[in-house]
């Protein structure tokens, strides 16, 4: 049985949720897309400042997941995620559970955006207790808290 389904999300338009209970460490869905070079991403206006669907594979390549067939692109960011992104082979990216996930729970992961990456353009609506209001990787949230005195 497929582990996920597309839903209307309270976080951001659409999302994915668990269709069954999912165990921690279970692979849920492969993040699929087109392999492009960093140079292509820098030169193509499609990418501009919107890095939402790009994953770095290595020093030369990125994976552009902004395609209809890639349902994993619908997984939203959360400051308290239940999934993580694993790049096990430098060519395939998997979304994997980091804890047990209950049926009908929305799937989420930390997008890992840098504090220096126009964070004000990426507002977070996850609603978790530790949300800082912007999509910033966990290791950089202290910088934002210090800047805005949270």
Residue ranges with predicted function:
Residues 79-150:
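C-terminal SET catalytic tail plus cysteine-rich post-SET Zn-binding segment of SAM-dependent SET-domain
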Residues 1-86:
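Catalytic cores of histone-lysine modification enzymes
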């Amino acid at each position: 049985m497929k582990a996920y389904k597309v839903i209307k999300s309270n976080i951001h338009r659409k999302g994915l949720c668990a269709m069954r209970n999912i165990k921690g460490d279970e692979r849920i869905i492969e993040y699929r897309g087109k392999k492009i070079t960093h140079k292509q991403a820098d030169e193509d206006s499609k990418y501009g400042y919107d890095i939402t669907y790009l994953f770095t594979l290595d020093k030369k390549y990125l994976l552009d997941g902004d395609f209809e067939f890639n349902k994993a692109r619908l997984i939203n960011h959360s400051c308290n995620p239940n999934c993580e992104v694993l790049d096990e082979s430098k060519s395939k990216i998997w979304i994997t559970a980091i804890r047990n996930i209950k049926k009908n729970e929305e799937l989420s992961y930390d997008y890992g955006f840098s504090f220096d990456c126009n964070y004000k353009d990426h507002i977070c609506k996850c609603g978790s207790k530790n949300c800082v209001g912007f999509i910033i990787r966990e290791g950089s949230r202290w910088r934002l808290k210090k800047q805005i005195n949270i």
